[in-house]
């Protein structure tokens, strides 16, 4: 089940140009308690210069940014310019964040990590069906 808890900081309030796919990351925060709620609090505080649409842990999935808005999760166009997949999905000189939904998996040490993966698969399936990807 997805719970919507939209952030007001670290959110550009800019519409995606076109939804072309989903990018899955992990938070790289393995500390105890680094679940989706902890990341919601982190990204809704000071300016972090990054964000994602969804945070998934072993118990919940939080949506922080609407699917049709930009989140800062992929990096910028210059850093990713040499990736072959980039030229297929992102126009030259544009930013990949304008085209992808970002999902962050919370793989903290006290999480059931198999459950995190299962919840992520469920979310991706729902999003692919919803957006006909």
Model regions and ranges:
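Active-site-adjacent loop/helix surface patches within enzyme catalytic domains
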Residues: 1-133
